[in-house]
A protein has these predicted regions:
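Internal glycine-rich alpha/beta core junctions
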Residues: 1-97
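Glycine-rich cofactor/substrate-binding loops
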Residues: 68-242
């Protein structure tokens, strides 16, 4: 059976197998649970009214709230987080089971019977997330609107990096002052930046692509999309999904 599971027998044991093997295994389960709960919590917050960039798909007759007919609560994502909160504390019990008096008492005989529930819970939330994420509704227009809220402030980072790369002696401070001016006047950061006579000697060296990144925050993505696809490809191959 061990061979079929890709496992090896312990190098030594008493009347019991060393409990550290189980502790490491369950820790991996709980750690995975945390990753899924973090994803669920991110999606849950992105569904809030003031953000509203994503949403769980709702059927025509589905009820989102028992008291507010208009609501579409992210109840599936909330379920995943709730399950994580319920099962994460069980890791403490697993650690406690490492202590076995004289390597053979029965103080873990009851507590270890609940370990399969952790596996069942993890499989359950995985299936739930697979189902919900495959039907996730995204709002690109809302994403663009949220990005525009700060009038391009996010491009302060590439602006100061480029200025420094072209030799400005204190690019961070220079851009910090530009952001203050942009906030005071309500003008986009890129507009204020490229209107600066003080910074013109360095700004003139920007390539068209670099200027576009500073003027258009939506272009400031680097290789994020490429990396995301790469990570997905790696795990699809490892999990036999490719």
């Amino acid at each position: 059976i061990l061979a079929e599971l890709g496992l090896e027998p312990a190098t030594h044991s008493t009347q019991i197998v060393e409990p550290e093997f189980m502790a490491d295994f369950v820790h991996a389960l709980i750690s995975t649970f945390g990753v899924l709960a973090n994803l669920a919590d991110d999606m849950r917050h992105l569904q809030r009214t003031e953000i509203a960039e994503v949403a769980e798909e709702f059927a025509a007759e589905q009820v989102g709230s028992s008291t507010m007919p208009h609501k579409r609560n992210p109840w599936n994502f909330e379920n995943v987080k709730s399950m994580w909160k319920a099962f994460t504390p069980r890791m403490q019990t697993i650690y406690a089971d490492q202590i076995c008096e004289h390597q053979r008492d029965l103080s873990n005989s009851a507590s270890q019977r609940f370990i399969p529930e952790i596996l069942v819970a993890l499989v359950s939330v995985t299936l739930r997330l697979n189902r919900i994420m495959s039907r996730l509704v995204t709002d690109a227009e809302r994403m663009r609107a949220n990005l525009a809220l700060t009038e391009g402030m996010v491009t302060a980072e590439p602006a100061y990096i480029l200025l420094a790369a072209y030799g400005h002696p204190d690019a961070h401070e220079a851009v910090r002052r530009i952001t203050l001016e942009a906030e005071r006047t309500g003008r986009p950061l890129g507009e204020v930046l490229f209107a600066s006579a003080e910074l013109r000697p360095w700004l003139e060296r920007f390539t068209p692509q670099q200027r576009e990144i500073v003027l258009n925050p939506a272009r400031y993505t680097g290789i994020a999309a490429q990396k995301a696809r790469g990570v997905c490809a790696v795990w699809e191959k490892r999990l036999g999904l490719a």
